[in-house]
A protein has these predicted regions:
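Domain-core and long-helix interface of multi-subunit machines
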Residues: 1-33, 74-77, 96, 121, ...
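Anion (oxyanion) recognition and catalysis
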Residues: 12, 16, 91, 170, ...
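Active-site or pore-adjacent capping/gating segments
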Residues: 37-113, 117
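Noncatalytic, beta-rich nucleic-acid-contacting surfaces in large DNA/RNA-processing enzymes
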Residues: 62-63, 101, 109-394, 446, ...
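Glycine-biased, low-complexity coil/linker segments
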Residues: 126, 399-401, 410-413, 444-448, ...
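Intrinsic-disorder-associated, low-complexity terminal segments enriched in Asp/Asn/His/Tyr and depleted
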Residues: 403, 411, 423, 433, ...
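Cationic, low-complexity basic patches in intrinsically disordered or flexible, solvent-exposed regions
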Residues: 407, 422, 427, 450-451, ...
Length: 752
């Protein structure tokens, strides 16, 4: 400032009088002088002003940048002791974020010597429930491998915390399912956190937990969206707001928001701002170009417009505001405020942590994502309606014997359920279904001529539907009347040891495990694109894909979920996969030179997807197997894929991957095509485990729609708002499936 010398002399006098040292610092607002213009823009955005009327709220010059040590010594040459004191002060500032010591909650290991002992005990108990006739060798090997890695990394308390939350939800009859990379874990499956059977899937545990990364695992659990709040309240009751809080998320400027805010600062009209921003998308600064402005009718040579475009490009990626994460909970052993910065949430008695998930990952702080999913609410309603109006659909021939077992007071929490005991008594070895549990009995009866099924259904489809005599009367929405008890099937985790018998009886509700697996009629329905309301495959794009892909197995649904995404489409993966699936194109797997590996190394990675990389795990395996990446480097590639739109660092792996594949004998053009496909994932690529978790819900919702379209329509209507379709479209679809939908009637209708 012009009066800097006078101010310095005055401050020196005050310091001498108070006998405290003088410290020299700069008023740093940006790192380099050329950023002064962007600082002015940010100031105007904060103050809701334009540059023309901001006045003295803006800095007078560009001196608020980070100056070098030599420049600071020159500016404070009249007070060298202030420079020396600044250095002395900095030398004493020894705090590092590495000193923050996060400790997992430990109270859930009561009764066990260590958290690892508790984890193994709970997982082994779950394995016995999942595999009542013996744990398969493949699963046993996976469990032992995961136990060892979890123990070495000290993550057992994290798994126990998630297990405790999921166990609470199931005890309350709340449908829940883990997804994401956690579905790679056999331990999570046995704990009941995820539903992807490791015996049937070839999943990569290191995608979830890796010794090279040494980062805490991140488990996402979906709960019924209408009852997620019950789970959140349980977390706060158990740990208190002093130990539990929601993580933050940093909202950054994208192309549209940057153009809008900078345009307002420069006084552009709303029409001009709308025209410039309306056709922008994503994070790319390159999209805000002179060519773009010219296409929408502006003159890029206009000085004001050129300045707007340049500053908008600089603003992209800057933090805009701090928001609350959709469901990421941080839970600690000690107090939150001793570990992380916190603030009050909008809701009373709740806390928000002022760090986002990337900050938490860097510091290895536990985060559990407690998410809401509308389809789980719909499926819960569907199962309740089936239990109430179609009890025979899941009835077992041994129903009476099960009831006698119940009356005998069998402790279902002690291990085996009554249905398992009776199956063992009859020595009928059951086949495990896609959900890893005992399949439900076959549906009884036939279907008479007045079938609710569409006329194009095949006879074998009709034969498995319940007969009209077995169906209860149902009119428009959820009907009244007393609910019937389930026929011997129970949620394997619905009770706690201290629950009363009455509470246990209230919790006898059907869960997704009773849905029969791999019914051809369900796949035929999906192949006709008859998927209105079905989870994940109800969009127009999915309906277009279904008749082309024609799913026939559960893994086909995994492919269906993953392939209709911007990543595979942009990476030119969809059409090659379809052509190969239909036999129109030969599947060819290039081989490395004999000195560098077996000829079928890529077939082992891409065989299931016909040579097309559709999943993040496959991209990681290609990098490791074909390009010589270390596992840690492959994980960095995954992270670059996940943040491609925002950060754009995937380009740094191009040369390493292409050169690595070429050095091992792969054709360079093939290596370039592989990289382009991987780059096409952007942040839209699915991990296979995530797609498998969603495919389970696809099949469950499709089965209910196929067999009981009235139940499915009622559940969808009572779960609104959710999905792609309005209630009128859901009603019309039900009518097209032969369902009579009546008007609201005070004698029959009920509320939910």
């Amino acid at each position: 400032r012009g009066d800097g010398a006078r101010r310095l002399a005055g401050l020196a006098a005050v310091a001498a009088a108070a006998e405290i040292p003088l410290i020299a610092v700069g008023d740093v607002l940006y790192h380099a002088p050329e950023r002064r213009a962007l600082q002015d823009v940010v100031t105007c955005i904060r103050e809701h002003l334009t540059l023309d009327n901001a006045g003295r709220r803006l800095e007078a010059n560009a001196e608020c940048h980070l100056k070098s040590a030599d420049e600071m010594a020159r500016l404070f040459r009249a007070a060298p002791q202030a420079i020396a004191e600044t250095q002395h002060f900095l030398d004493r500032c020894r705090f590092s974020l590495d000193e923050l010591s996060y400790e997992y909650p430990d109270e859930i290991r009561a009764g066990f010597a260590t958290p690892q002992d508790a984890l193994v005990a709970f997982a082994e108990e779950g394995a016995r429930r999942r595999y009542p006739h013996g744990v398969p060798a493949k699963v046993r090997h996976a469990l032992d491998h995961e136990y060892a890695l979890i123990g070495d990394l000290g993550y057992a308390p994290y798994f126990l915390t998630v297990h405790d939350i999921v166990r609470f939800a199931r005890a309350q009859g709340i449908l829940c399912q883990g997804r994401g990379s956690a579905a790679n874990s056999a331990v999570c499956y046995c704990l009941g956190v995820t539903e992807v059977d490791p015996e049937r899937a070839d999943l990569l545990f290191e995608r979830f937990v890796s010794a090279e990364r040494r980062e805490p695992p991140d488990i996402d659990v979906d709960f019924e969206h209408e009852r997620r709040e019950e789970v959140i309240q349980y977390i706060y009751r158990r740990y208190g707001r002093e130990r539990a809080g929601l993580a933050a998320t940093v909202i950054c400027y994208r192309g549209r928001s940057a153009i809008r805010e900078v345009g307002k600062v420069f006084g552009l009209s709303e029409d001009a701002i709308g025209a410039l921003a309306g056709t922008l998308w994503g994070w790319s600064a390159e999209a805000i170009s002179n060519e773009h402005a010219h296409r929408v009718g502006f003159d890029p040579a206009d000085p004001r417009l050129a300045r707007v475009l340049a500053l908008a490009r600089e603003l992209i990626g800057f933090p805009r505001h701090l928001s609350q994460h959709v469901g990421g909970f941080v839970i600690t052993r000690g107090r939150l405020d001793e570990l992380v910065p916190i603030e009050n949430a909008a809701m009373e008695e709740r806390t928000v942590i002022e760090w986002d998930k990337d900050d938490l990952d860097t510091l290895r702080i536990l985060k559990i994502d407690v998410l809401g999913l509308g389809m789980l609410s719909c499926l819960r309603r569907s199962l309740d309606l089936l239990q109430k109006y179609y009890p025979a659909c899941f009835a077992s021939p041994v129903e009476e014997e099960i009831d006698q077992t119940e009356r005998a007071g069998v402790d279902w929490e002690g291990g085996e359920t009554p249905i398992q005991k009776l199956n063992e008594k009859k020595q009928t070895p059951p086949t495990l279904d896609a959900f890893g549990v005992l399949p439900s009995p076959p549906l009884r009866g036939g279907r008479e001529k007045q079938s609710i099924a569409p006329p194009e259904w095949e006879e074998e489809d009709r034969a498995q539907l319940p007969s009209p005599r077995e169906r209860s009367e149902w009119r428009g929405g959820v009907g009244g009347g007393e609910a019937l008890q389930p026929s011997g099937y129970v949620d394997r985790c619905v009770t706690t040891n201290h629950a009363s018998r009455e509470e246990q009886e209230q919790k006898l509700r059907l869960d997704l495990s009773v849905i029969p697996p791999e019914e051809p009629a369900v796949y035929r329905m999906l192949s006709r694109a008859d998927s209105v309301g079905v989870f994940q495959v109800e969009s127009r794009a999915q309906m277009t894909m279904l008749p082309r892909l024609r799913p026939r197995t559960f893994y086909d649904l995994v492919i269906e979920v993953a392939i209709v995404r911007p990543g595979p489409i942009q990476g030119d993966m969809v059409h090659p996969y379809l052509r190969r699936r239909q036999g129109l194109e030969q599947v060819h797997f290039p081989s490395p030179s004999p000195a560098h590996g077996p000829p079928d190394e890529l077939r082992q990675v891409l065989g299931k997807t016909l040579g097309v990389p559709l999943f993040q795990e496959q991209a990681m395996r290609i990098a490791i197997v074909a390009a010589g990446f270390a596992p840690s480097e492959a994980d960095q590639l995954r992270r670059a894929m996940a943040t491609f739109r925002r950060v754009g660092t995937i380009k740094y792996f191009r040369a390493k991957l292409i050169d690595g594949m070429a050095a091992r004998g792969y054709p360079r053009d093939f290596a370039e095509r592989c990289f382009n496909q991987i780059e096409g994932f952007g942040e839209y690529g699915f991990p296979e485990s995530h797609a498998a978790s969603f495919a389970l819900l696809v099949y469950a919702s499709a089965w209910i729609k196929c067999r009981y379209p009235d139940v499915f329509a009622a559940a969808l209507l009572n779960s609104q708002p959710m999905g792609f379709y309005a209630p009128a479209q859901i009603v019309r679809d039900a009518q097209e499936h032969g369902i009579e939908v009546c008007a609201v009637d005070i004698n029959f209708s009920d509320w939910d």
